[in-house]
């Protein structure tokens, strides 16, 4: 049996590109790279985002076991979670083009963000934060609360209330939602990250390639669930993580296997003539991938995928191009659909 990747029309043979554990950085090396990524983002990205969103102070307050989603993008590689109550404050001086990063916490926040909290001078952590804010006298104080984006809605009510209770009335009037800043911080990749991301995508496709090969799939024997758990095991052996459970489903001439991620696959055993679809991603070096691919299982008398599948892929790719050609800044998805 040979599998055919419809996505780029390459026949899979027994010889496949395999991603091995030695291609993955050690935990120690990963820590070094993550620190470099974070420093690059602090130095080159955050000042730009704060200036463009008009927030000159961004305060992130989070607690152990109940972390703000944004804090997970900032955690030093030696920190697996926040510690007790962790407070970070970023102040951008637009005139001086300078970003000050501080932690109002018991410890420095890794190598990039020093702690400035002197408990002997001010034992109350929240009062120490307010003192720092007053010294900087920002125009806008951004906090992570949002009606629309969960990733930008990380501050809990108790911390929000505690902060405002310690602020003067004039200072509390400066508090605004950091929604736009938080979302842009999450969605924006630096040049350094994009170079690394290419490697993540290569690793992801390598795992899919191996999963869609005769090393893993024997038609008439292997189930879609077998492939799913092979992928999970492969990721574990490589020392990586998945950030969502993989999906493997089958499309046939009969009713397609569209179970919408909420049930068991109707087509359990993979057979010749099946079109296999996967949705799979990994987490590595603070980045996530999310890749989907198709593979066609050749019938015994076939050497290539049927013409109708090849044409269907071409049409699907054409639709993708139509959509992407209409992408414009601040244009909504519904607007693009209407124009397409």
Language-model regions: role of each:
Residues 1-22:
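Bacterial Sec-dependent N-terminal signal peptides
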Residues 22-340:
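Active-site neighborhoods and metal-handling regions in enzymes and metal-associated proteins
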């Amino acid at each position: 049996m040979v599998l055919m990747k419809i996505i780029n029309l390459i026949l899979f043979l027994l010889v496949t590109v395999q991603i091995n554990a030695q291609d993955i950085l050690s935990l120690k090396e990963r820590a070094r790279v993550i620190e470099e990524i974070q420093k690059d983002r602090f130095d080159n990205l955050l000042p730009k985002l704060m200036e463009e969103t008009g927030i000159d102070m961004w305060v992130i307050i989070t607690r152990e076991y109940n972390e703000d989603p944004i804090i997970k993008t900032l955690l030093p590689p030696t920190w697996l979670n926040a510690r007790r109550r962790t407070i970070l404050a970023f102040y951008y001086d637009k005139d001086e083009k300078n970003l000050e990063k501080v932690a109002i916490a018991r410890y420095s926040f890794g190598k990039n963000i020093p702690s400035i909290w002197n408990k002997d001078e001010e034992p109350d952590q929240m009062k120490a934060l307010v003192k720092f804010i007053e010294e900087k006298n920002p125009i806008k104080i951004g906090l992570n609360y949002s009606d629309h984006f969960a990733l930008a809605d990380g501050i809990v009510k108790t911390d929000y209330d505690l902060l405002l209770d310690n602020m003067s009335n004039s200072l509390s009037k400066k508090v605004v939602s950091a929604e736009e800043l938080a979302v842009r911080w999450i969605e924006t990749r630096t040049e350094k990250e994009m170079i690394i991301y290419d490697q993540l995508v290569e690793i992801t496709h390598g795992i899919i390639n191996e999963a869609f090969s005769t090393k893993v799939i024997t038609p008439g024997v292997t189930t879609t669930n077998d492939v799913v758990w092979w992928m999970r095991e492969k990721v574990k052996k490589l020392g990586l993580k998945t950030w969502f459970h993989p999906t493997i489903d089958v499309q046939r001439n009969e009713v397609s296997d569209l179970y919408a991620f909420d049930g068991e696959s109707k087509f359990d055993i993979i057979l010749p003539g099946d079109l296999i679809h996967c949705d799979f991603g990994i987490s590595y070096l603070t980045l996530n991938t999310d890749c989907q691919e198709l593979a066609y299982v050749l019938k015994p008398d076939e050497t290539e995928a049927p013409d109708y599948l090849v044409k269907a892929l071409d049409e699907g790719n054409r639709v993708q191009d139509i959509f992407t050609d209409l992408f414009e800044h601040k244009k909504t998805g519904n607007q693009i659909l209407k124009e397409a």
